[in-house]
Curated annotation (Swiss-Prot):
<dbReference type="InterPro" id="IPR029297">
    <property type="entry name" value="SPATA32"/>
</dbReference>
<keyword id="KW-0597">Phosphoprotein</keyword>
<feature type="modified residue" description="Phosphoserine">
    <location>
        <position position="138"/>
    </location>
</feature>
<dbReference type="GO" id="GO:0007283">
    <property type="term" value="P:spermatogenesis"/>
</dbReference>
<feature type="compositionally biased region" description="Basic and acidic residues">
    <location>
        <begin position="48"/>
        <end position="60"/>
    </location>
</feature>
<protein>
    <recommendedName>
        <fullName>Spermatogenesis-associated protein 32</fullName>
    </recommendedName>
</protein>
<feature type="modified residue" description="Phosphoserine">
    <location>
        <position position="135"/>
    </location>
</feature>
<dbReference type="Pfam" id="PF15310">
    <property type="entry name" value="VAD1-2"/>
</dbReference>
<feature type="region of interest" description="Disordered">
    <location>
        <begin position="24"/>
        <end position="98"/>
    </location>
</feature>
<feature type="compositionally biased region" description="Polar residues">
    <location>
        <begin position="77"/>
        <end position="98"/>
    </location>
</feature>
<comment type="subunit">
    <text>Interacts with syntaxin-1 and ACTB.</text>
</comment>
<feature type="compositionally biased region" description="Acidic residues">
    <location>
        <begin position="37"/>
        <end position="47"/>
    </location>
</feature>
Length: 334
């Protein structure tokens, strides 16, 4: 029992160990050989399978990459050319339409505000100031056609833009191509008178005092209360028709020619204060169009006692004032 060593266990000798190792090596070689044969058989089976049926799972390194690349260009070919054209042109057309519709709207907001004032009345006849005048050639024709004495220089609404009194003594600025300008004060006074006349809040005598004025006194009247800085270019409408004055034979005494007072001037200009700094530098471009309505029956044309001379009920005067007020941009002091 006390002897120890390799010889004590004959089964664990060198020869036996070598034999065991050789057997294990032989077993390993044999197992490796059979494994290689199995792999060869598997590859042969896999090579035969694609001929009959595609494999359910394909190696990702071989199959999917070329198949996806080939299928991508085939997808658009399934769609018809009509759907391709619709999908290609819908989005750009919508974008262009939106850009075109929003762009002028933004320019209008930045450039100024457009206002249109339609007025209709059948009871009032408006009288204009001497400074409201038409273009030079229209003025000459109006003076030749409707020649009046200096005492009857007050003109009706039918002659607001076709006839006026004598021009000021100072030589006007020569503008051969463009018509003469209409002042901002004149347009405001005229529009204010129309606004007052269209409402029933003010009595007719006061309205008559506001709108009427003699030419002799109006020449000496100062307009510093609404002196314009920028003139308004008047575009004379071709559709304007002259309304014949039905009471030219009436004596001038029946027409109350009264000059403008400071009170009435302030009321006329109260609708838009031109003395403000912003409006003094603003640019206003406007156009006034008169439309003559069809003549009604003689029974409806009988004048009322409370109406201003020169108009008859049933034959209203229609006009449209369209103007644009542009505020100047602030100047930068660089």
């Amino acid at each position: 029992m006390g002897v120890t060593g390799i010889s004590t266990f004959p089964c664990c000798g060198k020869d036996s160990v070598d034999i065991v190792e050789r057997q294990s090596d032989h077993h390993r070689h044999h197992h490796h050989h059979t494994h290689e044969e199995n792999e060869d058989e598997d590859t042969e089976v896999e090579a035969e399978l694609p001929r009959t049926e595609p494999p359910p799972k394909v190696d990702p390194e071989l199959g999917p990459v070329p198949q996806l690349e080939e299928m991508e260009p085939e997808l658009p070919s399934k769609t018809t050319p009509e759907t391709e054209g619709d999908s290609y042109t819908e989005s750009p057309e919508q974008q262009n339409y939106r850009m075109e519709s929003l762009k002028p709207y933004e320019e209008e907001e930045m450039g100024g505000r457009y206002r249109s004032i339609p007025v209709q009345t059948s009871k009032h006849l408006f009288w204009s100031n001497k400074l409201i005048q038409a273009s030079e050639h229209s003025l000459q024709k109006a003076l030749e056609k409707h020649h009046r004495s200096p005492q009857e220089k007050s003109i009706s609404i039918s002659q607001v833009y076709t006839e006026c009194t004598q021009p000021p003594s100072s030589p006007p600025v020569s503008r051969p191509t463009t018509p003469t300008a209409i002042g901002l004060a004149d347009l405001i006074n005229f529009a204010s008178s129309l606004a007052v006349a269209s409402s029933s809040n003010m009595a007719l005598p006061n309205l008559e005092n506001m709108i009427k004025g003699t030419s002799e006194k109006s020449q000496n009247t100062s307009l510093d209360f609404c002196q314009p800085v920028q003139a308004i270019k008047f575009a004379q409408a071709t559709q304007i028709t002259q309304i014949s004055s039905e009471k030219q034979d009436e004596s001038p005494k029946s027409m109350a020619h009264k000059s403008w007072t400071r009170e009435t001037r302030n009321v006329a200009c109260s609708y838009l204060d031109i003395n403000q700094a912003g409006l003094k530098t603003a640019t206003i471009q406007g156009e006034v169009k008169f439309v003559q309505t069809p003549i009604a029956s003689p029974q409806l044309q009988e004048a009322k006692e409370d109406s201003v001379p020169g108009t008859k009920k049933g034959n209203p005067l229609l006009l449209k004032i369209h103007f644009k007020l542009s505020s100047p941009q602030p100047q930068r002091n660089d």
